[in-house]
Amino acid sequence: MTKSEDIIKKTEHYGAPNYKPLPIVISEAEGIWITDPEGNKYMDMLAAYSAVNQGHRHPKVIEALKEQADKVTLVSRAFNSDNLGDWYEKVSELTGKEKVLPMNTGAEAVETAVKAARRWAYEHKDIEPDKAEIIAFNGNFHGRTMAPVSLSSEAEYQRGYGPLLEGFLKVDFGDVDQLKDAINENTAAILVEPIQGEAGINVPPEGYLKEIRKLADENNILFIADEIQSGLGRSGKTFATDWDGVKLDVYILGKALGGGVLPISAVAADSEVLDVFTPGSHGSTFGGNPLAAAVSIAALDVLEDEKLAERSRELGEYFQDELKKIDNPVIKEVRGRGLFIGVELNEDARPYAEALKEEGLLCKETHDTVIRFAPPLIITKEEIDDALERIKKVFS
């Protein structure tokens, strides 16, 4: 038995079966490359679901981590830490919003946005108590906690977890008329992934986000975007909503906000929205801790200094164009923006993900028939060409 096999056996024995990973063990990683205990190297084409946009162990992020770890790592929000204000300022300037609320995981940030939207609706829109509604979209994925699960349109994500939370409506992604019909006097917010990730990298019709912005303005509704996966350069722009040139009322950020090192998330909005929270009404022991703030500042500096959004846009266009040239009837469609790419197949995608793993390329199927290619944004054209050769070998 190899070391990897022994590790997998132990993991499956002691761990709850809530994941079905590819049969590989990762012991080291740097840049876009991953190494298993046997010394085999693989190209990372998943980037931890876009949490590793800056690449594995980016030197500037690791330097910030080590430097801060030698000072102070956690004080809780019972006290002020010396770098939290700097991080707030960084995220505020990035989003153009007045206030920031720090959390840890993306799901926590979604829960925060839902709570903020509901309280805002009661305090600023005078919706009757306990009647506020939030509109989401079929195919959405906002996390695994109860609000995101209740928002979901996937029966399997909800099975056995009832009673679900009330006050959530779902409409088809990209259908303006359905959205118009769903809006009523109790609508507090519209929550959208500007590119649906887990649903198979679904890009909305051109101008759709502008229509949402218009409807939100006309009806005094908060426009909230979950940019946890699609944001911070992944789509080829800082935020995927930038493709339609729209500004949001609420940004939900996560994943790459932590530079591939720590779980760091945030909700950014103007004072009218986030000032609905009062001391004790919401919080997190670890949210905005000194270590997280230092790492996230460095992670955002890397995104800006290395122009990773522009890099994603240019290389993503090239990658997609080359994928579209692969002549195989099993490939139904290649779609995406930047280095956020989905290859939809006419059959189950899992065997192809496993075959790509054997060729030294790590990716993952999503929504059964879609292979997601979302490498760290530091990838080079030469490395993309290398990946394309491996992909062509599997699909030849």
From Swiss-Prot:
<keyword id="KW-0663">Pyridoxal phosphate</keyword>
<dbReference type="InterPro" id="IPR034757">
    <property type="entry name" value="Ornith_aminotrans_bact"/>
</dbReference>
<dbReference type="InterPro" id="IPR050103">
    <property type="entry name" value="Class-III_PLP-dep_AT"/>
</dbReference>
<keyword id="KW-0963">Cytoplasm</keyword>
<keyword id="KW-0641">Proline biosynthesis</keyword>
<comment type="function">
    <text>Catalyzes the interconversion of ornithine to glutamate semialdehyde.</text>
</comment>
<comment type="similarity">
    <text>Belongs to the class-III pyridoxal-phosphate-dependent aminotransferase family. OAT subfamily.</text>
</comment>
<keyword id="KW-0808">Transferase</keyword>
<dbReference type="InterPro" id="IPR005814">
    <property type="entry name" value="Aminotrans_3"/>
</dbReference>
<dbReference type="InterPro" id="IPR015422">
    <property type="entry name" value="PyrdxlP-dep_Trfase_small"/>
</dbReference>
<dbReference type="InterPro" id="IPR015424">
    <property type="entry name" value="PyrdxlP-dep_Trfase"/>
</dbReference>
<feature type="modified residue" description="N6-(pyridoxal phosphate)lysine">
    <location>
        <position position="255"/>
    </location>
</feature>
<keyword id="KW-0032">Aminotransferase</keyword>
<dbReference type="Pfam" id="PF00202">
    <property type="entry name" value="Aminotran_3"/>
</dbReference>
<dbReference type="InterPro" id="IPR010164">
    <property type="entry name" value="Orn_aminotrans"/>
</dbReference>
<keyword id="KW-0028">Amino-acid biosynthesis</keyword>
<dbReference type="GO" id="GO:0005737">
    <property type="term" value="C:cytoplasm"/>
</dbReference>
<dbReference type="InterPro" id="IPR049704">
    <property type="entry name" value="Aminotrans_3_PPA_site"/>
</dbReference>
<dbReference type="GO" id="GO:0055129">
    <property type="term" value="P:L-proline biosynthetic process"/>
</dbReference>
<dbReference type="GO" id="GO:0004587">
    <property type="term" value="F:ornithine aminotransferase activity"/>
</dbReference>
<comment type="pathway">
    <text>Amino-acid biosynthesis; L-proline biosynthesis; L-glutamate 5-semialdehyde from L-ornithine: step 1/1.</text>
</comment>
<dbReference type="GO" id="GO:0042802">
    <property type="term" value="F:identical protein binding"/>
</dbReference>
<dbReference type="GO" id="GO:0030170">
    <property type="term" value="F:pyridoxal phosphate binding"/>
</dbReference>
<protein>
    <recommendedName>
        <fullName>Ornithine aminotransferase</fullName>
        <ecNumber>2.6.1.13</ecNumber>
    </recommendedName>
</protein>
<dbReference type="InterPro" id="IPR015421">
    <property type="entry name" value="PyrdxlP-dep_Trfase_major"/>
</dbReference>
